[in-house]
Amino acid sequence: MNDHQKNHATSQDDNTKSTPSKNSKHIKIKLWHFILVILGIILLTSIITVVSTILISHQKSGLNKEQRANLKKIEYVYQTLNKDYYKKQSSDKLTQSAIDGMVKELKDPYSEYMTAEETKQFNEGVSGDFVGIGAEMQKKNEQISVTSPMKDSPAEKAGIQPKDIVTQVNHHSVVGKPLDQVVKMVRGKKGTYVTLTIKRGSQEKDIKIKRDTIHVKSVEYEKKGNVGVLTINKFQSNTSGELKSAIIKAHKQGIRHIILDLRNNPGGLLDEAVKMANIFIDKGNTVVQLEKGKDKEELKTSNQALKQAKDMKVSILVNEGSASASEVFTGAMKDYHKAKVYGSKTFGKGIVQTTREFSDGSLIKYTEMKWLTPDGHYIHGKGIRPDVSISTPKYQSLNVIPDNKTYHQGEKDKNVKTMKIGLKALGYPIDNETNIFDEQLESAIKTFQQDNNLKVNGNFDKKTNDKFTEKLVEKANKKDTVLNDLLNKLK
């Protein structure tokens, strides 16, 4: 699963209504794309998750005649293989395989069965520090992909981006492997390294990342001139309380315009998203709609909006790593015209899941319902489009250049364009973005090699490629161009 997965239920005194379920459940948002948080992040994921706190007994009630016959067939096969197969079989493995098969048939990347060990791993780290690389992952179509790297995490610093596909861990293929197994491969001791082979576009590249301890802060506040920037990293217990305190502090400092930075926020607890919306939206208004077939429920605000928040203009900054609970909050603020949304289109996670635990500690997680914004927008697979688009600089979204090939002057290759864009961003004289390796590029590479104590030959070889990537990541981490663009727009 992931190094830090938020699977704790919301507290009973939360203002969030329960989901339309007969069981005692608590609503929680989870992105279920398991966070590679090897450095720590945590699958704080962000699909809305409904957590069941009851243990499941062996019940056959509610089944029709055909379903009872099917269940009887399954029991017969289980008993036959357990008793008569010529080699001794593990009862637990037979059971797990049967359940895995049923869940796999759903063809739903967010539904799965977890063993007791996997469930324990899933539930661990509800709070505190974690060791990992800080990248949230999910499995879809047999591929492991990154949902979002955690802010300031080793993964982000190494250049991992949302939607990167992880094909290998330490040069071992992870294609088709269970997500929890991949996470185990990525996790390790603090200070050790893990190499991820990532595919971005059509290119693959190895990225070496140093594992570290991560402590995830829910809300961070920074005064930028006459604007307050509040970075919300995830929706966890008391995130709304932390945000309230930060807004009150900003108000006392004379701040009347705040930016809520939700970039790469994978989600978390749904009730916290509702409470956070309640800071800006008055009592009795719908924040999110839940639908399961014909059954519908609306989660509404229960208090008046925060007085200090009413005095402020609000801008929300999002990107493709903003998911689930982030989208619930953003969707509500957008529908009620409480904020202007900037950045790029969000991830698009609009489904609700339920987890039910068995008496042996194992667990099944399955998609149960979907959610919609107050105005009825279903964003699953679509995301939320910002009111004002702020593009990420070209050099921050370049495809990786394979490091198993050396490029020379005269070659024609799409990766040559990537070299030119990157070197231009680093300040080297490039006046075209063609895919032809020309004299100007060779000259720029020679200067780059000289500046970085590399062998000066004008060829784009592995060592040059590695340093090229390192410098681009360093530049991206040093200057937040998207936030700066937004701050300039607000002047």
From Swiss-Prot:
Disulfide bonds: none annotated. It is a single-pass membrane protein. It is found in: Cell membrane. GO terms for biological process: proteolysis; signal transduction. Keywords: Cell membrane, Hydrolase, Membrane, Protease, Serine protease, Transmembrane, Transmembrane helix. The keyword Protease applies. GO terms for molecular function: endopeptidase activity; serine-type peptidase activity. The active site is at residues 324, 335, 349. Its EC number is 3.4.21.-. Residues 1-22 are annotated as: Disordered. GO terms for cellular component: outer membrane-bounded periplasmic space; plasma membrane. The chain crosses the membrane at residues 31-51. InterPro entries: ClpP/crotonase-like_dom_sf (IPR029045), CtpA/B_N (IPR055210), PDZ (IPR001478), PDZ_6 (IPR041489), PDZ_sf (IPR036034), Peptidase_S41A (IPR004447), Peptidoglycan-bd-like (IPR002477), PGBD-like_sf (IPR036365). Residues 8-22 have a biased composition (Polar residues). It holds the Pfam family Peptidase_S41. Residues 119-201 form the PDZ domain. It is an enzyme of class 3 (hydrolase). Belongs to the peptidase S41A family. This is Probable CtpA-like serine protease. It comes from Staphylococcus epidermidis (strain ATCC 12228 / FDA PCI 1200).
